Every structure is written in structure tokens, then in C-alpha cells.
């Protein structure tokens, strides 16, 4: 009889822990958004989760949500919908995408600066519920980013959800379910996600499968190389958008105006070309 009571108590404790909300959960949800992606005809393709990592609207999500998309929107915690402006980087192998949303003044999550050790508590915060587990094993990516294996498998609805430590700091994103375990990708892997003139094979594959505007590379020299390659592959309207953003970002660079003037000449917009040449 005592044995049955003991087992019942253990089960009740397990259920209580699974359903318990960490103290920081309500605050964290203010930085979590819902994502909708759309096809070329404006039809809804997929829905997922994203979370903001800076005040200017930079966010991270599961790449699979964006694969094949021509447009995306995010709905913040207040229920307001915002367009995704640019893709800032993506990786096919590790299924992570970084993007900029047309939203200002968001409260970003604080990213954990240190790796979590085996046995550390991990809290996965979904749209409505939270699951807690602990770190069962770890492996390294590129020698500096951690790939965590958890002590349990979460529901597929948590794919792409943010994962926190006991301090409420952002550790990673739910990446995959394999066997009886869920795996979490280190948030800091987002540091590798950027737009480059010559991207890696994994980044190139991911970016080619997202039919949305990408941000410019982070420095002028590489951005000029990026412009050159895009002049060979982008449509006139796409290329004009890229050149316009380049001249806005680097207004002192004469090369940007020259390239735009060349495009205007090709489009027979001679007055606009003349403005850029003078």
C-alpha cells in the first residue's frame, strides 16, 4: 500500500513539474512572436515561432518555417502583425534563420553567455505551455557552439521554440526530435548567420530556398561584391531595391550611384540616371 502511495506521489510531482511555469515565463513571452509564411500567391504556407534578440526587431526562427516562402509576417505578444523586412542569414544544415521585422522597441531576450553543463535545467517556452527537462549530453559545433540533447522528447509543436536556463537567459532553439530525445541548438549559432557575397554551401542552399529580400553584407567592400553578383542574377526590380539600400547605407560611396545610374540607363530612365551621375 505504501509503495503504491509513493509511486502516486512521484507521478503527481512529475506532472506538477511538467506543468509548472518558471517565474520568468510571462516576461519571456513578451519577446516571443508567431510567424506566418506565404507562397508566391499569398497563400499561407506554414506557422511557427520566432523570438527577438535585439531591440531593432532582429529575430530567430526555425528555417523550415521559411523554406520556400515569398513573404512572412510576425505577430507580437500584443497581437500586432508586422512584415518581415529582410532575411539576415540562414543555415539549411542546422535549420536556423535570422531575419529583420518591421518593428521597433521590442524587448529582446538575454542570451546566455556560457554553455550549460550536463544536468542543467532547461525550460522550453511555447505559445501557451512550458516543458522543463535537463541536459543529458552535449556536442560541439564549429568548436564553439553547443548542441544539447535533452532528457526527454517534447511535442512537435515546440519545434523552433526558445529554450531557457534557470536564470531566464536564452540558451537555444528546439531543433529536432530524434528517438526519445529532443535536441536544442545554441542560440549563439546565430552569430554565423549573415549575408555574404560568397556564402557557404549550407547558407547558399538555405537562402536560395527563401524567396524574400536579403539584407546587405555588414561591410562596404563585401557589399560591393554582393552588388556585382546580384547584377548578374537578380531581376531589375530586385536589383534596384538592393542598390537603393546600398546607397542609403553607404551614401558616400560613389560606386553605388554609378551602378544605379547604369541600371536606370538600361531601363531608359535617363533623368534618374543623370541625377545619379551628377
Predicted regions and their residues:
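Bacterial Sec-dependent N-terminal signal peptides
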Residues: 1-23
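A conserved glycine-rich beta-strand in the N-terminal activation segment of trypsin-fold
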Residues: 21, 38-56, 62, 82-83, ...
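C-terminal cap/linker of serine protease catalytic domains
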Residues: 22, 173-238
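A short, Trp-centered hydrophobic/proline-enriched beta-strand micro-motif
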Residues: 26-39, 124
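Short, glycine-anchored, charge-dense loop/turn motifs used at functional sites
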Residues: 56-58, 163-172
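Alpha-helical segment of the N-proximal tetratricopeptide repeat
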Residues: 215-267
Amino acid at each position: 500500500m505504501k509503495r503504491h502511495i509513493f509511486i502516486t506521489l512521484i507521478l503527481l510531482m512529475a506532472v506538477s513539474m511538467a506543468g509548472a511555469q518558471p517565474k520568468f515565463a510571462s516576461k519571456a513571452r513578451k519577446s516571443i512572436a508567431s510567424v506566418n509564411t506565404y507562397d508566391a500567391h499569398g497563400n499561407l504556407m506554414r506557422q511557427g515561432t520566432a523570438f527577438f534578440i535585439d531591440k531593432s526587431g532582429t529575430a530567430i526562427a526555425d528555417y523550415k518555417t521559411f523554406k520556400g516562402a515569398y513573404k512572412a509576417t510576425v505577430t507580437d505578444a500584443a497581437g500586432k502583425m508586422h512584415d518581415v523586412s529582410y532575411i539576415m542569414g540562414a543555415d539549411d544544415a542546422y535549420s536556423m534563420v535570422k531575419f529583420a521585422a518591421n518593428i521597433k522597441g521590442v524587448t529582446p531576450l538575454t542570451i546566455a553567455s556560457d554553455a550549460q553543463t550536463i544536468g542543467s535545467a532547461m525550460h522550453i517556452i511555447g505559445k501557451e505551455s512550458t516543458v522543463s527537462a535537463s541536459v543529458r549530453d552535449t556536442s560541439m559545433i564549429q568548436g564553439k557552439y553547443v548542441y544539447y540533447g535533452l532528457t526527454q522528447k517534447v511535442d512537435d509543436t515546440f519545434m523552433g521554440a526558445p529554450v531557457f536556463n534557470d536564470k531566464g537567459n536564452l540558451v537555444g532553439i528546439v531543433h529536432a526530435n530524434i528517438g526519445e530525445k529532443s535536441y536544442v541548438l545554441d542560440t549563439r549559432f546565430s552569430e554565423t548567420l549573415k549575408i555574404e557575397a560568397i556564402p557557404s554551401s549550407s547558407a547558399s542552399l538555405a537562402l536560395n530556398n527563401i524567396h524574400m529580400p536579403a539584407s546587405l553584407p555588414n561591410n562596404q567592400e563585401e557589399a560591393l561584391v554582393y552588388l556585382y553578383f546580384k547584377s548578374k542574377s537578380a531581376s531589375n526590380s530586385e536589383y534596384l531595391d538592393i542598390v537603393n539600400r546600398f546607397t542609403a547605407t553607404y551614401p558616400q560611396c560613389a560606386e553605388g550611384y554609378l551602378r544605379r545610374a547604369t541600371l536606370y540607363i538600361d531601363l531608359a530612365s535617363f533623368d534618374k540616371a543623370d541625377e545619379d551621375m551628377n
